[in-house]
Amino acid sequence: MLLVGRIGKSVGLNGGLKLHLESDFPECLKKGVKVSVAPINAFSRASSFKDYVIHSYEHAKNLLFLETIHTPEKAKELTNLGLFMSEAESKKLCVLKEGEFFYCDLVGLSVVEENEFLGKVIEIQRISQIDYFLVETTKSLVEKGLAKIFLIPYRDFYIQEILLQDKKITTHNAKTLLENS
């Protein structure tokens, strides 16, 4: 399951929900699309997920309406939970442009700079509208006293190329970030 957003407060009398989007693809939130709601930390517990169907989504207002939620009381039960979509459904609904990737496809890729393996992407975080690769440093570099984990901004200055078929990200200047972490 992929995290699409975080559900905020109840809005209005018809069960509207403020949605704090975690995705770059709001067009996936269409009427009739199946989504799941669960605590944010529920990734590994399938029993935590409750399924819903989207009634509508107003992107300008970040308002989500689910088909079976029609009262503020029912909406409040979902406050502070995560909105999830299956990986297959996400890939079916979201059309990627050249150079765009799903986070789930980038996690696990090797980070390489000048033929030196720096580590693996373990997570992607968005901070102030910038995506960062959270990289677990390779053991040999950690043994040399470098940080166990470091961040690489997803910017051209650092990221040269993403090769999904080779399962690697080639970088430039990322080792300097590691050395200064």
From Swiss-Prot:
One of its GO terms (cellular component) is ribosome. Keywords: Chaperone, Cytoplasm, Ribosome biogenesis, rRNA processing. GO terms for molecular function: ribosome binding. It is found in: Cytoplasm. It comes from the Bacteria. Residues 98-177 form the PRC barrel domain. One of its GO terms (biological process) is ribosomal small subunit biogenesis. InterPro entries: PRC-brl_dom (IPR027275), PRC_barrel-like_sf (IPR011033), RimM (IPR011961), RimM_N (IPR002676), RimM_N_sf (IPR036976), Transl_B-barrel_sf (IPR009000). The PRC barrel domain binds ribosomal protein uS19. Binds ribosomal protein uS19. An accessory protein needed during the final step in the assembly of 30S ribosomal subunit, possibly for assembly of the head region. Essential for efficient processing of 16S rRNA. May be needed both before and after RbfA during the maturation of 16S rRNA. It has affinity for free ribosomal 30S subunits but not for 70S ribosomes. HAMAP family: Ribosome_mat_RimM. Belongs to the RimM family. This is Ribosome maturation factor RimM. It comes from Helicobacter pylori (strain HPAG1).
